[in-house]
UniProtKB/Swiss-Prot annotation:
UniProt miscellaneous comment: Protects Streptomyces, which is an antibiotic-producing bacterium, against self-intoxication.
Organism: Streptoalloteichus tenebrarius (strain ATCC 17920 / DSM 40477 / JCM 4838 / CBS 697.72 / NBRC 16177 / NCIMB 11028 / NRRL B-12390 / A12253. 1 / ISP 5477)
Enzyme Commission number(s) from the entry: 2.1.1.180
Protein name: 16S rRNA (adenine(1408)-N(1))-methyltransferase
A Pfam family this chain is assigned to: NpmA
Function field: Specifically methylates the N(1) position of adenine 1408 in 16S rRNA. Confers resistance to various aminoglycosides, including kanamycin, neomycin and apramycin.
Residues that coordinate or bind S-adenosyl-L-methionine: 32, 55, 87-88, 102-107, 191-193
Ribonucleoprotein as UniProt keyword: no
Effect of mutating residue 191 to A: Loss of kanamycin resistance
Amino acid sequence: MRRVVGKRVQEFSDAEFEQLRSQYDDVVLDVGTGDGKHPYKVARQNPSRLVVALDADKSRMEKISAKAAAKPAKGGLPNLLYLWATAERLPPLSGVGELHVLMPWGSLLRGVLGSSPEMLRGMAAVCRPGASFLVALNLHAWRPSVPEVGEHPEPTPDSADEWLAPRYAEAGWKLADCRYLEPEEVAGLETSWTRRLHSSRDRFDVLALTGTISP
């Protein structure tokens, strides 16, 4: 594993991860974390849970990862780990009890729309049976459509149940609920994408998909 600590990238062995994981009640994984502010909030609010955040662009995690690695008096969080990795090639994690994919873009967006069953199965493989998931989709990716959405129409709660749920099920994901988030819920995600996009629009629509994973 490649751990990001500020501008440095450190090797983090499987044994080191298992030793760290053993100190906490559960593991939360945030895939495509961007600047990493969402997992920082989760880790701060849940000191008994290990939070792992990863992104393909290590530079975006530099600032927050340095803060997380500092002493607790300076904002450090010992239960937070930032990794440089892609959703296509996840590090050898295990025991994840909660999976977050918020405002995905690029190949990650294509994957959670069902275009890459391998990606969905890969994320399921690092989860324990019964793990929960939250996928939050920025619907403005369809207004107008960006190349990543391909031929997928803008999802709605009804259409997600119709065409996305079966694709998820094939990969071990059981879609239980699909709904639009209220403005305060969007703000509560604590991501730079939500703040940036919301500030440029009178209305910012996010569709949340939740359920469980049984790899």
